[in-house]
A protein has these predicted regions:
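N-terminal helix-turn-helix DNA-binding core of bacterial DNA-binding proteins
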Residues: 16, 23-26, 30-77, 88, ...
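Alpha-helical linker/hinge and terminal dimerization helices associated
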Residues: 28, 32, 71, 114-132, ...
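A short, mixed-charge helix-start or loop-turn motif at secondary-structure junctions
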Residues: 10-19, 108
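C-terminal regulatory/oligomerization modules of transcriptional regulators
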Residues: 1-13, 136-163
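Conserved amphipathic alpha-helical interaction elements at protein-protein interfaces in regulatory
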Residues: 38, 42, 58, 84, ...
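Alpha-helical initiation/capping and key positions within long helical/coiled-coil segments
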Residues: 20, 24, 77, 106, ...
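Charged, amphipathic alpha-helical coiled-coil/dimerization segments
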Residues: 4, 83-146
Length: 163
């Protein structure tokens, strides 16, 4: 087999959107996001806030950098979300007692209360997304998505070590 056969030219590669795992995951993610936004909107929570609140409900008091890493957001994006949530009275920033350069982000009582109001709505969105699936199918779906994440995560790590 020649090198040409092993590396087809870009124009000869076919990947219909219906067979593109990335495209299908992205489309599914966007639909779930849109539906979730509609469900949580009455509580004046944006999707941008939602991702940070979800992390803080489990790990209150993280630094801005830790919060960025957990959510997978750039630090300027995180700061913007924090300031917005702070203005809404959902979080407060407190200087780190060990390193005055860092801020720890803590939920306020108002921010904690949102968990009981919005988390059931998110659970409903997920349940509606997998309506008609058996528990085994849901387990398989989660296993396959986890494998994709591991595969791509390993490739990203390879790029990170090349720098």
């Amino acid at each position: 087999m020649s090198a040409k056969d092993q590396n087809p030219s870009p124009s000869s590669v076919e990947l219909p959107l219906s067979r593109s795992v990335g495209y299908q995951i992205r489309t599914t993610h966007r639909l779930i996001q849109r539906y979730l936004q509609l469900r949580i909107h009455p509580h004046r929570v944006t999707l941008g806030m939602w991702y940070f609140l979800r992390v803080l409900w489990n790990e209150d008091g993280l630094t801005q950098r830790e919060l960025s890493n957990r959510v997978g957001a750039m630090e300027p994006t995180t700061l913007s979300a924090i300031l917005s949530m702070e203005n809404r009275g959902l979080v407060k920033r407190v200087r780190d007692s060990h390193d005055r350069r860092k801020w720890n982000i803590f939920l306020t009582s108002k921010g904690r209360k949102l968990k009981d109001l919005t988390l059931p709505l998110a659970a409903d969105v997920v349940n509606e997304a997998v309506a008609g699936f058996s528990e085994q199918e849901i387990d398989l779906l989660l296993k396959l998505l986890g494998a994709i994440q591991s595969n791509i995560g390993a490739r990203l790590d390879e790029f990170d070590t090349q720098d």
